[in-house]
Regions:
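Bacterial N-terminal signal peptides
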Residues: 4-15
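Metal-dependent amide/peptide-bond hydrolase catalytic core
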Residues: 19-21, 207-218, 222-469, 473-497
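Acidic/His- and Gly-rich active-site-bordering loop/insert found
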Residues: 20-140, 159-168, 347
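Stable alpha-helical elements in mature extracytoplasmic
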Residues: 33-41, 55-59, 63, 148, ...
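Solvent-exposed loop/turn segments at secondary-structure junctions
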Residues: 50-52, 83-86, 100-102, 113-117, ...
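Loop/turn elements at helix/coil->beta-strand transitions in domains of secreted/extracellular proteins
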Residues: 73-75, 103-106, 167-170, 196-199, ...
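Short pre-catalytic strand/loop immediately N-terminal to key active-site residues, enriched for Gly-Thr
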Residues: 133-144, 412-413, 453
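Acidic/histidine-rich catalytic neighborhood of metal-dependent amide-processing enzymes
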Residues: 136-137, 143-221
Length: 497
C-alpha cells in the first residue's frame, strides 16, 4: 500500500538552531475562555476516575453539563452505564451536536474519561489535586487524557457560543474503561452503533505534536494504525515445602529465569506502509546523525536486526520496529517460611499490526520452555485491526491547524501508535479513526502518561481548544463566523512505485 506516502512532508533538519521554548509563547485562546477551560479541566483532574472507584460518572456529568449549558438538548445527551471489569460499574457519555441541515455523514470524536491509578506516596504532589507550576498543569490525566476530553468539549461549546452550525452531525463519545478492558468502545462500535455511526472518527487520545529538548519541532504524527494489545500470564509451579530445606528448583527462581529471557529477547523487526513512511521522514530529519544512519540502513534492509535494535535504543523510537513484550506485575509464594508452590508474572505485549496474538504466545512459550505456562489474559483477547486509509481532508485540516498554532516547522507525518486506544475497536467495525489531538510536550521529559508526576504544558492545553475549533470548522463546514485562517496544503513527494 502507498496510503502514507502521498502526505509525507519534508522535516526540518535536525541540525537547525535551537528555537524559542514553546512553553513560554502566548496562547491563542482568549483569556475569558482560558478561565472557563481551566476550571473544567481542574474539576476533571480532581475526580479520581480510576477503575473500581466509581467516579467515571462524575466526569461524564461534568462534560455533559458543558454541552447542556451550550444548548445541546437532553435528548442528544446519553449516559450509557455498563460493566467493565467484573464488578466495576462505569459509564460512557455520547453527545450528538446536530447539524440543522446535514449534507454529510456524521463525524465521531473519541476520548476516554478513566485514568490509570496513581499512588500518592509515589508522586511529589497529590496526583488528584490539580496543580499549575512552572508552565505546567500537573495531575493524573493531564496528558492521558482529560486534556483531550475538555479541549474537544470546550472547543464545541465555544463554537456554539459563536453561532457556528456544522453541516454534519458531530458525535462525541467518551468511554469509561479505555485503560482497562475497552468494553465501552466495543459496545459503542457494535450495540450502540445507532448512536455512534459515522463516516470517520477523530481520536483525542494522545497529542500529535512534540518538541525535543532543544525546542526543535519533531513534527505532528497522525496515527493511522495501532499495535495490538495483549497481556499474557507466565506461571511456574513447584511442590514447595519448608523454607528450612530449600530445593534445587524454585518456582520464583524459575519465573525469574523466564523473565530474564524476555528482557533480552528481540522479536523480528517489521515494517508496514505507515511505519516505513514515518522512518523515511525521521531519516530526513536526523540527517547524517548516528540515528539517521541506522534508520537508512534498516530501510535499505528490513531484516537488519542490528540496525533496528539501534533505532529502538533511542527513547523516541521505542516500540516502532517490532512487537515488544515487557513484565509489568509479579506475584508468588504463600508464606514467608514456605517454599513457593507457584509464581506468576504479568507480561504485556504490544504486537505489530498483522501479527496474531496466538503466534506471539507460541513464540513466547518456545522462548521460556515447557516448564513455564504461558496463557493469554482471558478477559481480553486482542484483535489485530487494519490501518485507516488516507483522508486528504483530515491531513489538510490537521496541517493547517497545527501549523497555525506551532509554525510551519511542525510538519505532519503518518505514524503507528505503540499504545492502544478505543480507536482500534471502531477500526475493527469499519469506521476509520485518526489520532490527531493537538496538544504537545517536550520529548522525552514530558512523556509521563501512566507514570509519575504526569503533566502538560499550560499553553499546550489552551491552544488545544483553539486547535479543535479549527478542526471542527475544517471538517464540519457549516455556518457562522468563519475562521480567518487560510488553509495550508501539504506538499507531496514524488509517488513511489
Amino acid at each position: 500500500m502507498k496510503i502514507a506516502l502521498g502526505i509525507l512532508l519534508a522535516f526540518t533538519a535536525a541540525t537547525a538552531v535551537a528555537a524559542t521554548d514553546p512553553r513560554t509563547l502566548p496562547t491563542k485562546l482568549e483569556p475569558a475562555w482560558q478561565a472557563k477551560a481551566r476550571e473544567v479541566f481542574k474539576q476533571a483532574i480532581e475526580i479520581p476516575s480510576v477503575h473500581h472507584r466509581g467516579q467515571v460518572p462524575a466526569v461524564a456529568k461534568l462534560l455533559a453539563d458543558q454541552f447542556r449549558a451550550a444548548g445541546i438538548p437532553e435528548s442528544d445527551i446519553h449516559f450509557m452505564p455498563y460493566e467493565a471489569l467484573p464488578g466495576d460499574q462505569t459509564e460512557a457519555l455520547i453527545v450528538r451536536w446536530r447539524s440543522p441541515h446535514a449534507t454529510r455523514k456524521p463525524m465521531l470524536i473519541l476520548g476516554h474519561m478513566d485514568v490509570v491509578e496513581a499512588k500518592r506516596s509515589d508522586w511529589k504532589y497529590d496526583p488528584f489535586q490539580f496543580r499549575e507550576q512552572d508552565g505546567y498543569f500537573y495531575g493524573r490525566g493531564t496528558s492521558d487524557m482529560k486534556n483531550g476530553d475538555v479541549a474537544t468539549t470546550m472547543a464545541a461549546v465555544k463554537l456554539m457560543s459563536e453561532g457556528f452550525k456544522p453541516d454534519r452531525d458531530i458525535i462525541f463519545f467518551y468511554s469509561g474503561d479505555e485503560e482497562t478492558e475497552g468494553r465501552g468502545a466495543t459496545l459503542a462500535s457494535t450495540k450502540w452503533r445507532n448512536l455512534t455511526d459515522a463516516e470517520f472518527g477523530l481520536n483525542a487520545d494522545g497529542g500529535c505534536a512534540s518538541y525535543d529538548e532543544q525546542f526543535r519541532p519533531l513534527g505532528c504524527g497522525i496515527s493511522m494504525a495501532e499495535k495490538t494489545f495483549q497481556t499474557y500470564f507466565f506461571t511456574t509451579h513447584n511442590p514447595g515445602g519448608h523454607s528450612s530445606r530449600p530445593r534445587p528448583d524454585n518456582a520464583i527462581y524459575d519465573l525469574a529465569d523466564a523473565l530474564k529471557k524476555i528482557q533480552n529477547y528481540r522479536f523480528q523487526p517489521m515494517q508496514n506502509a505507515v511505519t516505513r513512511a514515518y522512518f523515511e521522514a525521521r531519516a530526513k530529519q536526523e540527517g547524517n546523525s548516528p540515528l539517521g544512519q541506522e534508520i537508512r540502513a534498516w530501510l535499505a534492509n528490513p531484516n537488519d536486526g542490528k540496525a533496528a535494535d539501534a533505532i529502538e535504543a533511542n527513547p523516541l523510537e521505542v516500540g516502532l520496529t517490532r512487537t515488544r513484550c515487557v513484565a509489568t506485575m509479579l506475584s508468588g509464594g504463600h508464606a514467608d517460611n514456605a517454599l513457593p508452590q507457584s509464581a506468576t508474572a504479568t507480561v504485556n505485549c504490544r504486537i505489530f499490526p498483522g501479527v496474531q496474538p496466538t503466534d506471539v504466545q507460541v513464540e513466547l512459550q518456545k522462548l521460556v520452555g515447557p516448564n513455564v505456562e504461558v496463557k493469554p489474559d482471558p478477559n481480553f483477547i486482542g484483535v489485530p485491526t487494519p490501518a485507516s486509509p488516507l483522508r486528504p481532508d483530515v491531513v489538510s485540516a490537521v496541517t493547517a491547524a497545527i501549523q497555525k498554532l506551532d509554525g510551519p516547522g511542525m510538519e505532519v507525518y503518518p505514524e503507528m501508535s505503540t499504545g492502544a486506544s478505543d480507536g482500534s475497536f471502531f477500526r475493527a467495525q469499519g469506521i476509520p479513526v485518526y489520532d490527531i489531538d493537538g496538544s504537545w510536550g517536550i520529548s522525552p521529559i514530558d512523556e509521563r502518561a501512566h507514570g509519575l508526576d504526569e503533566r502538560l504544558p499550560v499553553r499546550a492545553f489552551y491552544d488545544d481548544v483553539v486547535y479543535w475549533q479549527m478542526i471542527f470548522r475544517s471538517l464540519a463546514g457549516g455556518e457562522g463566523p468563519s475562521s480567518t485562517q487560510a488553509p495550508v496544503q501539504p506538499t507531496a513527494p514524488p509517488e513511489r512505485g
